[in-house]
């Protein structure tokens, strides 16, 4: 990751990273709301309470009980992955500038993986990873640089639990902050979503 970080960010002392990250995260202009045509009232729960990081382990997909993410819901009562208001797919947008480092596009209903069709984007300014899950379509490829607000894919119902009728159609959005020792630690994106730029 350090190689990627060095390639895609301005040359600054590593000891200033936390100050720079804190500054960027406080300004709403840095982030784009990740769903076109929707706003903060689409975020699940009250005041972001759906976020639960306790027990999270990125390297153990069988770990249960945590939910270190925000779910953002859309109007899709018939669960066909189309917006009830427009009868069109719902665009998933990149929250920030970054490098696509991984995607999944071949999820099937027989798979036990919970994320379905997902996208990982590395933000070298924040030195962290954004994870966008449950997409019906992925329209970026690994190695592609994306801009804030750029379309990554389309919302769907892929994933072990997300495709079931009990689950409303939503984006599962997670952010992992990479620590100096290289381990990823989840951070709540709710404050960023509240100030993010909206896209029509």
Q: Predicted regions: what is each one?
A:
Residues 70-84, 128, 133-135, 175-187:
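Small beta-barrel nucleic-acid-binding modules, principally OB-folds
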Residues 73, 122, 133, 156, ...:
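Residue-level detector of conserved, well-ordered beta-strand and adjacent loop positions
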Residues 85-89, 93-136, 166-170:
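Zn2+-dependent peptidoglycan hydrolase active-site motif and core
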Residues 1-5, 10-12, 141-150, 154-157, ...:
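Acidic, glycine-rich catalytic/binding loops that coordinate metals and/or anionic ligands
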Residues 1-91, 95, 191-200:
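Polar/charged, compositionally biased leader and regulatory segments
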């Amino acid at each position: 990751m350090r190689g990627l970080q060095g390639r895609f960010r301005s040359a600054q002392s590593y000891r200033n990273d936390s100050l720079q990250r804190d500054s960027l995260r406080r300004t709403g202009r840095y982030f784009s709301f990740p769903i076109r045509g929707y706003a903060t009232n689409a975020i699940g729960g009250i005041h972001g309470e759906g976020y639960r990081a306790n027990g999270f382990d990125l390297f153990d997909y069988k770990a249960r009980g945590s939910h270190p993410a925000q779910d953002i819901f859309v109007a899709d009562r018939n669960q066909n992955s189309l917006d009830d208001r427009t009868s069109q797919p719902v665009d998933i947008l990149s929250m920030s500038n970054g490098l696509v480092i991984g995607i999944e596009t071949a999820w099937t209903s027989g798979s036990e993986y919970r994320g379905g069709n997902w996208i990982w984007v590395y933000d070298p300014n924040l030195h962290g990873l954004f994870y966008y899950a449950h997409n019906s379509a992925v329209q970026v490829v690994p190695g592609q640089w994306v801009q804030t607000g750029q379309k990554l894919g389309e919302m769907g119902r892929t994933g072990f639990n997300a495709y079931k009728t009990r689950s409303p159609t939503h984006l599962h959005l997670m952010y992992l902050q990479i620590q100096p020792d290289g381990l990823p630690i989840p951070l709540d994106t709710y404050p960023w979503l509240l100030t993010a730029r909206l896209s029509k």
